Design a protein with these regions (language model features):
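A general structural motif
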Residues: 1, 50, 75, 172-174
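Short coil-to-beta-strand
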Residues: 2-11
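Active-site-adjacent alpha-helix immediately C-terminal to a catalytic or transition-state-stabilizing loop
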Residues: 4, 62, 70, 145, ...
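Short, well-ordered beta-to-alpha junction loops that form the rim of enzyme active sites
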Residues: 10, 55-58, 83, 114, ...
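Loop-to-helix element that buttresses phosphate recognition and phosphoryl-transfer chemistry
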Residues: 11-69, 79, 144-160, 201
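Phosphate-coordination/substrate-recognition cap region in phosphate-metabolizing enzymes
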Residues: 40-131, 137, 189-213, 236-237
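Short, well-ordered strand-loop elements centered on a beta-strand within folded domains, enriched
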Residues: 217-230
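Short, cationic low-complexity segments
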Residues: 229-237
Length: 237
């Protein structure tokens, strides 16, 4: 048997400000640090031995994972993949969600956030928030850097990297992935065979480890959030 632990980063600065963040590299807040510490202590209480750690390229995911590893007193290397990044919100990047609801209507903003294949307008490549203009992405081929993404686009890149680098490890090891709301939703769609309607309802809380145990046939035998007080509904389980 093996384990996969999925952790959405602790609250970020732009989570607090209610802004569309996407690929912008913001840090976590004080509350986010506390969430990461609690996640680490919950994992410590489970007495788990994590064999492999993965994170996106983004600071909020890496900082969350570093705090968790410090609490676990584990010095194993973190493997970073940009494909685990948050969904790119295109021209919505940096905008306040409530202001967009007032401007476009709540239903339209909900569609942008939750629909499967709807992409927001592209983010201008001259915009300071565009990934092409951020140092952390300078080694990614420019033709692979998106201007906008749907959840389907996010799913495709996340599952491609999961299949290539992580899936085989999960068969016989305990793996922890620190990522983002939409990249974790993509993984949940794949692992739990969710349809497009189910994935639109799935909420991923910040800083709460999702514990997934597999049997020897790679079937899920157990799934739960470690922090019951902050658990969201697991619509599929």
């Amino acid at each position: 048997m093996s384990l996969l632990i999925l952790v959405r980063h602790g609250q970020s600065v732009w989570n607090l400000e209610n802004r569309f963040t996407g690929w912008v590299d913001v840090d976590i807040t004080q509350k986010g640090e506390e969430e990461a510490k609690k996640a680490g202590n919950l994992l410590l209480k489970e007495k788990l031995n994590i064999d492999y750690y993965f994170a996106s390229f983004q600071l909020r995911a890496k900082r969350t994972l570093s705090i968790i590893k410090e609490i676990l007193n584990d010095n194993k290397e973190i493997q970073e993949f940009w494909e685990l990044n948050e969904r790119h919100y295109g021209a919505l990047t940096g905008l306040n969600k409530d202001e967009m609801k007032a401007k476009l209507g709540e239903q339209k903003v909900h569609e942008f956030r939750r629909s499967w294949n709807l992409r927001p307008d592209k983010l201008d490549q001259n915009n300071s928030h565009h990934p092409r203009n951020l140092d952390i992405y300078k080694n990614i081929p420019k033709d692979l850097i998106p201007d906008t993404e749907s959840l389907e686009d996010t799913y495709n890149r996340v599952i491609k990297i999961y299949d290539k680098h992580i899936r085989q490890l999960v068969k016989k090891n305990n793996v922890l992935i620190s990522a983002h709301g939409n990249s974790i939703r993509a993984l949940c769609k794949f692992l739990f065979k969710l349809d497009e309607n189910q994935i639109s309802k799935l909420e991923i809380p910040t800083g709460n480890p999702l514990y997934i145990r597999f049997d020897n046939n790679e079937d899920i035998s157990e799934c739960r959030y470690l922090d019951n007080e902050r658990a969201k509904d697991l619509v599929v389980f």
